[in-house]
UniProtKB/Swiss-Prot annotation:
Keywords: Cytoplasm, Nucleus, Repressor, Transcription, Transcription regulation. Residues 246-260 have a biased composition (Polar residues). It holds the Pfam family Whi5. Component of the MBF complex. Negative regulatory component of the MBF complex involved in cell-cycle-dependent transcription. The keyword Cytoplasm applies. This is Transcription factor NRM1. Residues 239-260 are annotated as: Disordered. It comes from the Eukaryota.
Amino acid sequence: MVMSLERLPLQEYTKSAMNNLATSGPVIMTSLTEGSSLSKNSVGMGLGMKLPSIHSLINQKNSYNPFQTTLHSKSFSVGDPIKANNSKPLGVTLTSTDSNKRLNTSISALLTDNKSPGKANKPETEKETMNHLVQEDTVDKAHYTELSKKLQIRLQLAYYKYRTKQEHVKFNELKALHSSKPKKASKKNTKRRKLVVSHGNFKTPAKRKEHKLYTTNTHNLQDVSTDISMSSSTSSLMSKRDSSLQFHDSNDTTNDFTTPIRNANKRHLGQKQDTPMSVKAAKSLIFLYSSKV
């Protein structure tokens, strides 16, 4: 078989036992030929497994993979360098108990406490070594699970941005767009009422009230005018009030949100009496003008 024309795929070599070498095993394996069993095998101490030669890989068939050794089986045979009278090597059978003992001793030697250099390193018991290994496995699993969750979330977010064509949008902006909490309506802050001295068309907090005083007075004056016993003085007063009302209404340029122009000469007796808006305001005005401070 030519290597350049026909060779095994890379997957079969990666899954084979040649890439799963035991660091603590004392067995050394060299090469296997197609027709024979273990041709060159030797037993060493703490040297691990040796890779087979390239010729054995080239000369073997595609269906035959000699590197798939069953280490977890009950027994396996390894060649012995000690030879008998015959030229053939003798086979030595190693049971699974022997291999487990050697593995345990090598693991315990690696996990010994090196804090006291003066004393000899004592091997740990099997329970301590197993507990130590289990703790390391749990820590690694917890660490990798957290990393996998973070990566999963980031992948989901990236896929969502790609599907919705929002690659430039940040996570906080997406969260604000999809937030289900209703926004509270901003309440309008009502301003406090203030005593404003008006000298023109200035805005005030309160709306202008209707001139009810004018209407009531006009109704009363109409009733008085219908009376037969109305004097000449009342009729002259009525004419003056009507003329003043007409003059005020014609020159009124104010609206409901502004303070009207107040002229003392144009106002009648009822309008000149300005009272405060509340009892509290009246008391404050009385205290202001009566105090000697």
